[in-house]
Amino acid sequence: MVVQSMLSGTQPGGPERVPANNHFAAHTGPSYSIEQITSEDDLANLREDWNRLSETAESPNVFTTFDWFRAWNQRFTQEAPRRRRLSVLVLKKDGAIVGISPLINRTASRFAVVVRKLEFVGLADYNDFLLGNGPTGQIEAIMDFLVQTQDQWDLVDLRDLPKTGNTLAIVESALSYTGLIYRILPEEDRSPYLLIDAPWSGMVSRLSRSSRHTLRNQQYRLERMRGEGLRVRVIENPQEEPELLEKLIALEGQKRVNGKLVPPFIGRYPEVFQSLFDTLGPRGWIYVALMELGDRPLAWQLGFRCGKRLWDYTKAYDHAFSRFSPGTMLIPAVLDYGFSHGFEEYDFLRGEEPYKMIWNTGYHERFRLAIWSRRWISRARAFVYLDLKTAVYRLFGRSR
């Protein structure tokens, strides 16, 4: 189903009409109309325009691509079909698609209180709206749409929005006249990054003496193994590598944090990552760095190529070779690849683990945008989900 809207007015409770064809209609300014996509068939029809917007974005972001959204949404909907539905907002101007807000409507429960949330699909380090030219007007149109459809949701909870450019200022300005209540919070985890302005040999020379000593010793030990068949590859087309996904999953089964085995990530969602390999791989979004001893994988890193940036998404290594730090020592190979191919930044993504701190030259920050209406039921549910939930999580040492 497509719910179509032309927005008008900025006050909550403004005039709205539901025609017999189940299309919601209202009016908001002459520039933009909005369609709310709620079915898989209508979502599939967006592929071409969605890909166009994501590939021509000023800051390309794999987490805002059509195939990322669809693969994860299909999996999560299978797990909880009654609690999730599409709520993708498509912005049009003069009949052409100029922006997309990739949202889903999810029913969550906290302390026996049911909350209807609009949110991003999840498992992304950077979420965002897909906006073309005129982002100010497009964000204003999105916020107006939220006002006119506030009976469909209790809380808009947008996590991990990148704190770059003037997006935050535009959002606050757009919200200031809607009558909606909102809160902007910094996300706890920052994303360390490293500028790629030299090959690895040049970068390592800038590190502390102890870090240089450690990394060069590790590199020396690995170099000695080249005679035994050690090699490192950066695979640009993972979809063409036979049984690559199976190798990643097998090695991930040994992954440890603080010495303890951790639940698999890729192994939990093999069909999702196979879909991402098949769809995003041919379009140049994915790379896999692989360290092998003969035919035996020792370490891998799955990452993304987003414009001039490399994003380190997830990795694993053979615990039997942990003394060689094979996971960490994939980074020099990826940095050399990045430098030789014209990339300008290596982003470690979410988290400030010690090995990242050796390299990083700065941090990217993200923020959380929570919106609710002045209706008492929305206020009460937002309080339970945001304030009460946060207090309980802090009491028991949890986050997010």
Q: Which role does the model predict for each range below?
A:
Residues 27-29, 119-123, 150-151, 223-227:
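Short, flexible turn/loop "capping" segments at secondary-structure junctions
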Residues 2-20, 130-185, 201-202, 228, ...:
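Intrinsically disordered, low-complexity, positively biased terminal segments
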Residues 76-77, 128-132, 139-145, 197-204, ...:
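Noncatalytic linker/hinge segments flanking ATPase motor cores
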Residues 2-32, 36-40, 105, 168-206, ...:
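Active-site/acyl-donor-binding loops of N-acyltransferases
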Residues 33-117, 161-191, 195-201, 205-322:
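A conserved beta-strand-loop-helix scaffold within acyl/acetyltransferase catalytic domains
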